[in-house]
Amino acid sequence: MLLAWAAATAVLAARTLRLSLSLPTINVVRAAPSRNRLPAYLARATAIAAVITQAGIAVTGSVVRVTGSGLGCPTWPRCFPGSLVPQPHPEVATVHQWIEFGNRLLTGLVGLVGLACLVVAVAVRPRRWRLVSLAATMPLGVVVQAVLGGVTVLTGLTWWTVAVHFLVSMVLVWLAVLLVAAFTEGDAPPRWHLPGPLRGLLYTATTVLAALLVAGTLVTSAGPHAGNTATPRLTVSVPALTQLHADLLVGFLGLLVGLGFALRAAGRVPARTWRRYLVLVCVVLAQGTLGVVQYLAGVPEVLVSLHVLGAASVVVVMAALWTSCRVRDDLFAVTVGSARPLASAGTG
C-alpha cells in the first residue's frame, strides 16, 4: 500500500510540474562582506566536526548496546560508587566497563566540539542570533543526551530510554548539517528552488524518514540487542515490527523515486541538488541492503553497528539535500544610494 501511495504521489507531482510550474527570478542585492574574527573555513570545519562527532557517538552507543556493556559502569555520572573510572569487579567484566567508560569519554569530546561551534558562531560579526541559536543546540544537545544517558543507566537500560537516546542523536546530526550550511548562507527567509508540490514531496519524504527511524528503534527494542540479557524488551512481535520497518523503507524509496522524476520535470534545479539526491538514493539502497542481510544473518553485532552508521549517513545526506533546495540571502537595509548590512551569511 505504501509503495502504491508513493508511486501515485510521484506521478501526480510529475504531471503537475510538467503542466504549469515555473520558478520566478528574484534579484537580490547582497550585503557587503562582514569582518569576522575567524576565517570561514575554520567555522565550517568546526560545524563539520559536529556532524562527525554527533554521528560517531550514535555508532559507539550501538557498540555499547550490542556488546551488553550498557551497565559496564553501573552508576552515573561515576563509573562505580566512589570512582569515575573502571575498577576491578567480580560481577562486571573489565571489557564491558571500558566500552561504556569510553563512550562516556566520547561524550566529553562531543561537548567540546559543541562548545567550539557556539564560540565560533558568537565570534561572527555582525552578531547573528539565528546562527548563534542553531550553534547553541550542539552543547545543549550534549547536556540533554547526558541526562538521558544517566536515566538509561539508572533505569536498567529500559528500552524506551535507549530508543529516545538514539533518536535525539539523529535530531542533533540533522541540526549539525544545518549548522554547516549556516556559515555560508544568509539570514533572509529561504527562497526555494522547488515549486510548492515538489516541496510537499520533500516534506513528506522527510516525515517518512523520521517514521522509518522510529520503527528501526522499535525493532531493536524488541530484538536481541536491546541491552543486557536481563533488560526487559518491548513486548511486540519482532517479525511484525520488522515488516513495518520494511514497508516504511519501501515507501521512502518510492517517494525518492517520485522526487527524482519531479526534479527532472521542474528543471532549473542546481547541480549540487542533483548530486546530493543521487548520493541519498545510493546510501538508502545500501542501508536497505544491509538491513536485509542483517536480518537474514541473525542480526550479528557488527552489522547492527554498521546499520546505525548507515542510519546516521542517511540523515546527513537527507539534511544536505534539504539545504541544497533553497537559498538564504544576506539581510540588508536600503537607504538612498547605499546598502547597510543587518546580518551576514546565516543559517538554514
Residue ranges and their predicted role:
Residues 212-253, 257-260, 264:
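Membrane-interfacial catalytic/cofactor-binding modules of polytopic membrane enzymes
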Residues 53, 140-141, 199-220:
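Alpha-helical transmembrane segments of multi-pass integral membrane proteins
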Residues 121-136, 261-280:
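Membrane-interface helix-loop-helix junctions at transmembrane boundaries of multi-pass membrane enzymes
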Residues 5-12, 110-116, 169-184, 248-259, ...:
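Hydrophobic cores of alpha-helical transmembrane segments in multi-pass inner/ER membrane proteins
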Residues 64-73, 143-166, 222-233, 288-312:
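Interfacial helix-loop-helix junctions of multi-pass membrane proteins
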